[in-house]
UniProtKB/Swiss-Prot annotation:
Name assigned to this protein: Tropomyosin
Record remark: domains: The molecule is in a coiled coil structure that is formed by 2 polypeptide chains. The sequence exhibits a prominent seven-residues periodicity.
Biased composition (Basic and acidic residues): 214-223
Region (Disordered): 202-223
Length: 284
């Protein structure tokens, strides 16, 4: 009888131990399922964050493309301004050559006046009048030369400004190339994140750190784009200023051409008077 009681007691204890072990296993199972659910939730969150990063990357890439288009437009405008400056410089060169020819003609007229001064006293008064006019023309030509030098200086200054604008555009282009390289690095990082998602159970913490780093790089891209946009605005402002300078220079060239034409007409009048004076002297 005692043996039966002991056996029953042993069976009861074994049953209780089995129940305890079952409860422990059930608890472990629940804990495991909760851990699994948490890991799956973290995985879903990381996948969403990765998708958001891809969308943000596409947006940044579009902004870079827009910045490149604006840069190309600015470069075209600067090229056009350089061509206009080149044309204006050619006009100034032609004006200088024309002015030199006018000076040679005036020198010839002066020599003729000197010859006329050697004639009899009856022609001396007419020669003095012509000489006075010639001196006035000399002063006018000197004034024109000074104005032409000033216009040439303005053209050279405009060329220097264009060179500076071209240099800054080249720097902006280098910065833009760097900005293009950074999205490629971001794309490679996203691919790396996708690979790490396959082993999320062991690399969850590492993925979270990578996500934070990607977010920081995104902020850096946005800052770079803002800087490029500002530089493009500066380039556009410089191009606008160059247009105003070219317009001012063109007006100055037109004015010089008008004054040169007037000087030619004065020279023709002097030549006619000289011819008339020589004709009168020949009559004496």
């Amino acid at each position: 009888m005692d043996a039966i009681k002991k056996k029953m007691l042993a069976m009861k204890m074994e049953k209780e131990n089995a129940v305890d072990r079952a409860e422990q296993n059930e608890q472990k199972l629940r804990d495991t399922e909760e851990q699994k659910a948490k890991i799956e939730e973290d995985l879903n969150n990381l996948q969403k964050k990765c998708a958001n990063l891809e969308n943000d990357f596409d947006s940044v890439n579009e902004q870079v493309q827009v910045a490149m288009a604006k840069l190309e437009t600015s470069e075209k405008r600067v090229t056009e301004m350089e061509q206009e400056v080149s044309g204006t410089t050619r006009k100034i060169t032609l004006l200088e050559e024309d002015l030199e020819r006018n000076e040679e003609r005036l020198q010839t007229a002066t020599e003729r006046l000197e010859e006329a001064s050697k004639l009899p006293d009856e022609s001396e008064r007419g020669a003095r009048v012509l000489e006075s006019r010639s001196l006035a023309d000399d002063e006018r030509i000197d004034q024109l030369e000074a104005q032409l030098k000033e216009a040439k200086y303005i053209a050279e200054d405009a060329e220097r400004k264009y060179d500076e604008a071209a240099r800054k555009l080249a720097i902006t282009e280098v910065d833009l190339e760097r900005a293009e390289a950074r999205p490629k690095a971001a794309e490679a990082k996203i691919l790396e994140l996708e690979e790490e998602l396959k082993v999320v159970g062991n690399n969850t913490k590492s993925l979270e750190i990578s996500e934070q780093e990607a977010s920081q790089r995104e902020d850096s891209y946005e800052e770079t784009i803002r800087d490029l946009t500002q530089r493009l605005k500066d380039a556009e402002n410089r191009a606008t200023e160059a247009e105003r300078t070219v317009s001012k220079l063109q007006k100055e060239v037109d004015r010089l051409e008008d004054e040169l034409l007037a000087e030619k007409e004065k020279y023709k009048a002097i030549s006619d008077e000289l011819d008339q004076t020589f004709a009168e002297l020949a009559g004496y």
